[in-house]
From Swiss-Prot:
Function summary: Catalyzes the hydrolytic deamination of adenine to hypoxanthine. Plays an important role in the purine salvage pathway and in nitrogen catabolism.
Active site: E192
Binding of substrate, residues: D271
Organism: Sinorhizobium medicae (strain WSM419)
Keyword Translocase appears in the UniProt entry: no
Name the UniProt record assigns to this protein: Adenine deaminase
PANTHER family: ADENINE DEAMINASE (PTHR43114:SF6)
Broadest EC class assigned to this enzyme: hydrolase
Cofactor: Zn(2+)
Molecular-function annotations in GO: adenine deaminase activity; zinc ion binding
Protein family (similarity comment): Belongs to the metallo-dependent hydrolases superfamily. Adenosine and AMP deaminases family. Adenine deaminase type 2 subfamily.
Length: 324
């Protein structure tokens, strides 16, 4: 059991953390039929494309600051009750704009929920604004410009998510230059749906501190060595990888091989209810399906805190809290 271990998470898309029962309540609030996206209490999707459609449908059920405050507080409370001391949530102002709420109000709603969870449960959290890859490079530049100019104290990083097989990484280098110059931490989805080349491209064109997923780097021994040598942190999401058929099962998942090769890896849940998982379950998977010891799992949590996009005093407090 890993319930006694402190936890930290760097990779969870906040709309993707919506429990189906909360989605149903939101749908009733707005008179929306969920029959095509929820069946028998579970989200309905078959592949990455249909997963994105289901995700977007769920995101459309959150339309006010209060809705987003509720979502953020609920998720962070769940994490805190499982022993989590730090969380980074991936947020998309594009969703706020799509529902007519606006990006500013979207972030303020989430921030209110984050602050409420901290007040009630003590959990520290930050937001990473994400560009949506399949919306194209210019849309991502606009998101980057917004992230760079809207300096909310809880927004500390920038990500690129979405359909990894659309557009080259190089096409997004301008967007990452904008947020790098603004002092935001950088991470990018790579090495999930696309192979090792996408991780290499991300390192060459974006120069991120972290890679979201990155697990298909295992296909290239030289790349694995480069990740280890450069200290790039991978935000690994085993349950997501199995659900999306990146790997067929946990025994074939490369987390153990990456760890043993000296790559800095962390445990994350990605879009937990969509993939029938949770951060607590990811820790259990690491222990029981992958054979990691408590000490090794603790090391991954420490890596997450060392790589967190926070100021140094906050990092020191979190590291000190790891073994209290």
């Amino acid at each position: 059991m890993t319930a006694h271990l402190k936890k930290a998470e760097l990779h969870c898309h906040i709309e993707g953390a919506t429990p189906p029962e909360l989605a149903v309540r939101q749908a009733r609030k707005y008179g929306v039929d969920t029959g095509t996206i929820i069946r028998d209490g579970a989200y309905v999707w078959e592949d990455f494309t249909s997963f994105v459609k289901c995700y977007d449908a769920v995101a459309s059920l959150f339309r006010t600051e209060g809705d987003y405050a509720l979502l953020a507080e609920a998720y962070l409370t769940e994490l805190a009750e499982a022993g989590t001391i730090y969380s980074e949530i991936i947020v998309s102002p594009d969703h706020g704009n799509t529902v007519g709420l606006g990006a500013d109000a979207y972030l303020e709603g989430l921030a209110a929920g984050m602050e409420a969870a901290k007040a009630r449960k003590g959990i520290e959290s930050r937001m990473l604004i994400t560009g949506i890859r399949h919306l194209g490079p210019e849309a991502v530049v606009r998101t980057a410009e917004y992230a760079a100019s809207h300096r909310h104290p809880l927004v500390t990083g920038f990500n690129l998510a979405g359909e990894e097989r659309m557009h080259s990484v190089a096409e997004f280098s301008r967007a990452f230059d904008i947020v790098r110059d603004a002092g935001l931490g950088l991470t990018i989805h790579a090495g999930e749906l696309s192979g090792a080349f996408s991780v290499r491209d991300a390192l060459d064109h974006v120069r991120p501190a972290r890679i979201s997923h990155g697990v298909r780097a295992i296909e290239d021994t030289d790349l694995v060595r480069r990740l280890a040598d450069e200290g790039v942190v991978l935000e690994v999401c085993p349950g997501s990888n199995i659900a999306l058929k990146v790997f067929p099962d946990f025994p074939s998942h490369p987390l153990r091989r990456l760890y043993d090769a000296g790559v800095r890896v962390t445990l994350n849940s990605d879009d937990p209810p969509f993939f029938h998982t949770s951060l607590a379950q990811e820790y259990e998977i690491a222990a029981h399906a992958m054979g990691f010891s408590d000490g090794e799992i603790d090391r991954m949590t420490r890596t997450a805190l060392e790589a967190a996009f926070v100021d140094e005093p906050t990092r020191e407090r979190l590291l000190a809290a790891l073994h209290i």
